[in-house]
């Protein structure tokens, strides 16, 4: 039903997969002249122009996935996304600024030097150029559906890679299939990125425990094929999910072994990954804090704050 259309990005992950069916486009890619020109060529090869696209479906609000939505919206396309994604995409610079403020303080409390915390949280400012704000016309969540080329696509919520993640499920050539964004990838393990609190003063989401639960539920839905946001199709979704969960369990146990005395999240990150460059420290902290959250949820560690430092220690 959907045709995969790889779109170039300026990011380390490489090309992002857009998906095209009739006049509907899923995840058009980042807002760059290179991506726009490439996508126009791909559409022209199918006797289409940007003005012909009537509907954009967005799996999650990361710049490499939704950035070009604004150009299509300006040409009359409707934009469909989860309400949480819609809120982020409506003011991406403002969302990023709030994230920077939260994580600058949080990373210092995790044991990061103030100068490093500044550098880590300032890096995403470069993303703003590729993600102009866009208004969402249709807001959907689990249980809703959208029509594409005469077919009903069911929406389900996902957790773990970004706020406001959703999948679009449909009956395809191999059976039950779904476009899943970056929640499950064929060749690389998705990053369980840290997320700020949903509102000021609230607790931050514990992303990795929720991601593990979401993956287990998705595995039990018994899909036959996933269409991911990067690289090739996932031909054995339950098996791939099991592999990801096994990787998570192995890393969680590595973290547990390291907590025989009080450790900060930064010390855990250093133990896991060594001397990471600044560009890799946000995903590194996401991994370290995520596995500490898993251990905390299982009552295997105690957590306390001393002298403005968060410390974890194994209870076993």
Features from the language model and the residues they span:
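Metallo-beta-lactamase
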Residues: 31-32, 150-240
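Hydrophobic "anchor" residues on beta-strands that sit immediately upstream
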Residues: 23-25, 56, 78, 177-178, ...
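Active-site HxH/HxHxD metal-binding segment of metal-dependent hydrolases
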Residues: 31-37, 41-145
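Short alpha-helical segments that sit at the start of domains
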Residues: 11, 230, 235-258
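Well-ordered beta-strand scaffold positions
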Residues: 23-24, 84, 144, 151
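Divalent metal-coordination and catalytic microenvironments
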Residues: 21, 27, 60, 72, ...
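Conserved beta-strand hairpin/beta-sheet module of binuclear metal-dependent hydrolase folds
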Residues: 1-46, 168-187
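C-terminal regulatory/interaction regions
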Residues: 254-316
């Amino acid at each position: 039903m959907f045709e995969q259309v790889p779109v170039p990005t300026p990011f380390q992950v490489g090309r992002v997969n857009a998906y095209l069916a009739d006049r509907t486009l899923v995840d058009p890619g980042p807002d760059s002249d290179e991506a726009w020109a490439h996508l126009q060529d791909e559409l022209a090869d199918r006797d289409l122009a940007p003005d012909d696209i009537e509907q954009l479906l967005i799996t999650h609000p990361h710049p490499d996935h939704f950035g070009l939505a604004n150009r299509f919206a300006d040409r009359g396309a409707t934009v469909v996304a989860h309400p949480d994604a819609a809120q982020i995409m409506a003011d991406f610079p403002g969302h990023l600024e709030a994230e920077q403020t939260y994580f600058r303080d949080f990373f210092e409390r995790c044991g990061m030097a103030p100068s490093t915390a500044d550098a880590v949280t300032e890096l995403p400012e470069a993303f703003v150029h590729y993600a102009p704000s866009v208004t969402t016309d249709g807001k959907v969540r689990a249980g809703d559906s959208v029509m594409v080329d005469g077919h009903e696509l069911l929406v389900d919520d996902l957790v773990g890679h970004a706020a406001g993640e959703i999948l679009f499920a449909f009956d395809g050539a191999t059976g039950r299939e779904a476009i899943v964004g970056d929640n499950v990838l064929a060749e690389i393990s998705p990053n369980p990125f840290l997320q700020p609190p949903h509102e000021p003063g609230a607790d931050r989401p514990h992303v990795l425990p929720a991601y593990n639960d979401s993956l287990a539920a998705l595995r039990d839905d018994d899909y036959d094929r996933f269409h991911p946001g990067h690289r090739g199709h996932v031909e054995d979704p339950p098996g791939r999910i099991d592999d990801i969960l096994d990787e998570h369990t192995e890393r969680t146990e590595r973290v547990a072994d390291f907590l025989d005395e009080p450790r900060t999240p930064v010390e855990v990150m250093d133990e896991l990954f060594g001397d990471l460059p600044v560009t890799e420290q946000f995903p590194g902290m996401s991994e370290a804090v995520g596995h500490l959250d898993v251990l905390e949820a299982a009552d295997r560690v105690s957590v306390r704050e001393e002298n403005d430092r968060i410390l974890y220690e194994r209870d076993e």
